[in-house]
Amino acid sequence: MKGKAGGKAADAAEKVAASNRRARFDYDIEDTWEAGLVLTGSEVKSLREGNVNLSDAYAMPRGEELWLLNCRIGEYKQAAHFGHAPLRDRKLLMNRAEIDRVRGKVEQRGYTLVPLRIYFKQGWAKVELGLARGRSHEDRRGAIAERESKREMDRALARGRRR
């Protein structure tokens, strides 16, 4: 029996297992998609513990499917005999039309698919993929300067409100 009326509030919450904050700094994210992950039991347990690293991960189409590569999901300690390989390729689940749309955009020069975060939505492991274009060193500096100026404006407004 669910605690809330209808049980929607508890199920609708997303529990973030890992986020790739560096990707938003290194790349311009132009579009995002949600995809399901095909995982083994020990991988799910390890994800729930937050034992995952997305820093070097990326996704790419192979044949008619999308795959997540270089995503390290650490071994689950209690899965002694039936553990998993931490760096194995993992299949992503999306609709055929979405996969075709993503494939068309990724095949353009300069674009890549980067996982932005892995989270649980209604008990299912999901990954948020971003269509990314690399930033140059100057672009990164511009982003830092823009962020700093926004902080300064927010601070000045906050000081003005306190008086």
Swiss-Prot record:
Entry keyword Cytoplasm: yes
Regions of compositional bias (Basic and acidic residues) in chain numbering: 140-157
GO molecular function, one term: RNA binding
Record-linked Pfam families: SmpB
Annotated GO biological process: trans-translation
Disordered as annotated region, ranges: 140-163
Stored PROSITE patterns: SSRP
Keywords associated with the record: Cytoplasm, RNA-binding
Cellular location(s): Cytoplasm
Record-level GO cellular component terms: cytosol
Principal localisation: cytoplasm
Family: Belongs to the SmpB family.
Function: Required for rescue of stalled ribosomes mediated by trans-translation. Binds to transfer-messenger RNA (tmRNA), required for stable association of tmRNA with ribosomes. tmRNA and SmpB together mimic tRNA shape, replacing the anticodon stem-loop with SmpB. tmRNA is encoded by the ssrA gene; the 2 termini fold to resemble tRNA(Ala) and it encodes a 'tag peptide', a short internal open reading frame. During trans-translation Ala-aminoacylated tmRNA acts like a tRNA, entering the A-site of stalled ribosomes, displacing the stalled mRNA.
NCBIfam families: PRK05422.1 (NF003843), smpB (TIGR00086)
Full protein name: SsrA-binding protein
